[in-house]
Amino acid sequence: MAEGGFDPCECICSHEHAMRRLINLLRQSQSYCTDTECLRELPGPSGDSGISITVILMAWMVIAVLLFLLRPPNLRGSSLPGKPSSPHSGQDPPAPPVD
């Protein structure tokens, strides 16, 4: 607690507000649980929401492979036998003329 009896944390989250949230949480859980059983399916988003994270990751992998296979020839770095890999055919470039 701060000096003078003023608590700045109480401006953000008071004890009454915390107790109100706790009571609401207990009331919600009581509507889904009885004395003998608790229902497994609570309200909210269900487990089978259609598309899972695995399907999304597999789709991204397929897109990445397709982009890799369909990249332009200048990014492929191909080394064809009749085509030199560099403009100087593996030799050092000529030295500049000295005047």
From Swiss-Prot:
Q: Name one GO cellular component term.
A: endoplasmic reticulum membrane
Any ranges marked Lumenal in the topology annotation, and which? 1-49
Span list, region Disordered:
77-99
A single GO BP annotation from the record? blastocyst hatching
Membrane topology note: Single-pass membrane protein
Transmembrane regions listed in the UniProt entry: 50-70
User: Which stretches are Cytoplasmic in the membrane topology?
Assistant: 71-99
Compartment annotation? Endoplasmic reticulum membrane
Could you list this entry's UniProt keywords, alphabetically sorted: Endoplasmic reticulum, Membrane, Transmembrane, Transmembrane helix
**Any one Pfam family match given in the protein's UniProt record, by short name:** DUF2615
Taxonomic superkingdom: Eukaryota
Tell me, in one coarse class, where this protein mainly resides: endoplasmic reticulum
- Protein name as catalogued: Small integral membrane protein 14
According to its UniProt entry, this protein's organism is Rattus norvegicus
